[in-house]
Amino acid sequence: MTIETLKTDGASLTLHLNGPDWDGARAATLGTVSFKTPQAGTDLLQQALARVRDAGLDRVLGPMAGDTWHSYRFVSESDGTPAFLMEPANRPHEPLIFAAAGFQPVARYFSARMPLDIYDPAPLPSPAGFTIDAWDGHDPDAMLREVFALSSAAFAGNAFYTPIPESAFLDMYKTVIPLLTPELIFFARRSDGALAGFLFAIPNYAEGPDTKAVILKTYASLIPGAGRYMVHACHVAARKIGYETIIHALIHDDNRSAARSRQEGGQVFRRYELLGLKWDV
């Protein structure tokens, strides 16, 4: 990945010239955005866009630190509550600077919270063709390798997907390993033991070690129905452990998970946008 860091006294960002495909052509991406003042941000953004044009590219996405495996999205609406663990954050004027330069939303997302005491813990009917189990807490490297392999398959059809090496994925998550709670990580397995789905949830340690909130961060499956069963298992386990609130984190507006969150009583408290700009060619 080609990465350049552009920086002035009042602004900085990273420029990635080997970004994902966007409508049939490679896009650049602008990530790690920090604009201390509107003027400093405007000036640096124009410098970055000129660099993109000089590289022969006609489209750019932002904020995105190279790909969707890394940090991306601006907060576009908020109820003002503090950011949860691993949530993107930005200054209010930063997305406005992008908009003034011609960027428009290309994808929208939200996070919702739900009190766990309203969730029905009654068991679901026995699943057909797979089982759901919590992680046993052993061999986190092996667990992450399985998750990487399934993620690569499950997310390959998503917009703006870019493959990354397994080593890069492991490097991203090795700092998170000490924070993991095995009872909040679930796997769906076929009858032969092959991984068919995973769910990753983590306590919201941004609130401190005694947090009463858990974040349902990511889940994916390769077989119909497994996602529903893993989500149910996560809600039931979080409530049993003593958590009071679950955060349905960073869900694409058009994803099936969005409808599921609403059905379960999730209340949106934050919205996000990924922005894009194309030039006429």
Listing of model-derived features with the role each one plays in the protein:
Residues 1-27, 31-34, 137-219:
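A conserved beta-strand-loop-helix scaffold within acyl/acetyltransferase catalytic domains
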Residues 21, 66-68, 253-254:
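Short, solvent-exposed loop/turn segments at secondary-structure junctions
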Residues 31-40, 64-69, 215-226:
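A short, internal acetyl-CoA/4′-phosphopantetheine-binding micro-motif in the GNAT/acyltransferase core
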Residues 38-52, 223-240, 263:
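Conserved acetyl-CoA-binding loop-helix of GNAT-fold acetyltransferases
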Residues 52, 56-69:
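Transmembrane-helix bundle segments that line or gate the permeation/cavity pathway
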Residues 72-118, 184-186, 198-221, 232-281:
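Active-site/acyl-donor-binding loops of N-acyltransferases
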Residues 91-159:
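Acyltransferase donor/substrate-recognition loop-hinge adjacent to the catalytic core
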